[in-house]
Amino acid sequence: MTPVTDSAASGSAWATGTKTYNNALDVDVYGTPQMNLTELAKAAGKATGNVTTSEIQDATPAAQMSHSTLRSCYGPQGKTDGSSNNAADQCEVAQLKENGGIGSISEQMLDTRADVTIGGGAKYLHQTVQGGEYAGMTVWDQAKAMGYETVEKDVDALNALQYDGKPVLALMADGNLQTQFAPSVATKKDPAKDENPITCSTNPDWLGNKNANGNSASLADMTRKAIDLLEANPNGQSNGFFLQVEGASIDKQDHNANACGQIGETDDLDKAISAALDKVDLNETLIIVTADHAHTSQIVEEQPNYALSTVLKSPVDGAKITVAYGTSPDQMYANDDAPKFDEVESSMSHTGTQLRIAASGPGAQRVNGLTDQTDNFYTIAKTLGLATTADEYKNLSAGMDFSVNVKDGKASLDVAGLNGDASFTYTVTDAAGQVVAQSGGTEADADPISGVRVRTTQTTSVDLTDKVAEGKAYKVTVTGRQTGTSLEKEIQIPAETTSEVIPGKPTGGNANAAGNASAASPLGKTGVAIIGVVVLAAALVSTGLAVRTIKSRRFGSAERR
């Protein structure tokens, strides 16, 4: 096992407070889903947001909205635009909905139902859902059916968004968002580079450029929009919010040995931090800035003999800035006829260097000295008054209840109040003791990633049509995966029910009360002010977190990320 983390494991560490293995998202070393900050904030009645310049399914943003043993499980058809299906290669079989699992990252994103989600990765939502209640629909259509306000690659529509009671899903590019600066290329040592240093130039395709209507979508723009929407949300106004903002391509361009790309994305993150500071009151909002791992690039005195480098010209004073890259596992110098880096993503590797973390606002005193990435979870959770212990998680699920309802000839098991668990299993047994319905089937149910994904503070519905019959009695058992909370009831299947249960819509009950009562929250309020957290993160050494949370970082698709 490598001592150097990838973005999935590091993002999971601060999202859940649990260590895991590289390529895994929000599961423990046994594969059991662990509650993340977004889910816990929702359980406590707070508004939640997730902003990134990467594909929204990438590791860092995915760690705030999904649980997956493989970070590559982007959608129900794997990692494609929907024209093909490679889910068998990109996902654990037991996780797929058609096999009784909790679903892909994109599907779980909709289940998580953050109030604001902004990033890239639009093409993966054109995949077709393979199992469950939305089978046969695209993920985009599923989002609309679940009540999302959707924006696809439309800067003007993003800027026009106002809070209207719906969760926002705005994906601004098919893949990762374009970088601020056009790319540079790292090459072998060459005296000519010192004579002609490179000046970084703006990328014409960067969404931060103003369009004909004067609108743009830089990371700072998206951060401002997210905070506006969260502060307009009644939950945000009454109970605070959690927002993670990621400057993802600092890391991605470091993998590519693209100095101009890195610098532009670092500038974009810096402006996003300024935007957050301008929007919030630091008496009421904790802002944390950090990174999930270190990387290859270093500013050095002169071009090294042992590594590739780029010589830049400072736009301030014209001084030379030499950036070196030396952590690629590829044989970069094996062939003297190949003088420059080929820009294959992930050819440069992460390092184990210690990272900078900075914080301002309530709870910032916890960010002091040498810390662990899992400590970020506790800093944020304690500041917001969220559950952090096994007993507190059990308390969140203590109010779990369920019923079987029939509408339009379809029977469903409707579960609510299981807010300390990310997933659950169920069995339905008839009067003769025969199991007629079961999550995942007998073998798959033993896999921790199988079962049903909990829609925190919402009704989670399971289709039992053709499994049960009207008028007959059944024993139904529902068990939370993480807390072990279990409830068994004898239920007689009714005729048509008059009450309408809409999967994915928020429900009443004790979810918020349980969330607030279960966790100590000494900083939950300052006077009458509601606390928020913003986390800003990057995939390199220089990034940050905030408790109305903003984050910048890259979780990528390749194994080394």
Locations of regions flagged by a protein language model:
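Structural beta-strand segments of beta-rich domains
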Residues: 407-413
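C-terminal low-complexity, Ser/Thr- and acidic/Pro-rich disordered "stalk" regions positioned immediately N-terminal
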Residues: 481, 487-524
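A post-motif C-terminal structural segment
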Residues: 1-5, 10, 58-401
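Surface-exposed, short loops/turns at beta-strand junctions within beta-sandwich domains
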Residues: 419, 454-456, 461-472
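Solvent-exposed serine/threonine-rich low-complexity stretches and specific carbohydrate-binding patches
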Residues: 436-455
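Conserved aromatic beta-strand anchor motif in extracellular beta-sandwich/beta-rich domains
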Residues: 426-430
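C-terminal membrane-anchoring or membrane-association module
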Residues: 533-561
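Short, aromatic- and glycine-rich surface loops/edge beta-strands on solvent-exposed regions
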Residues: 470-482
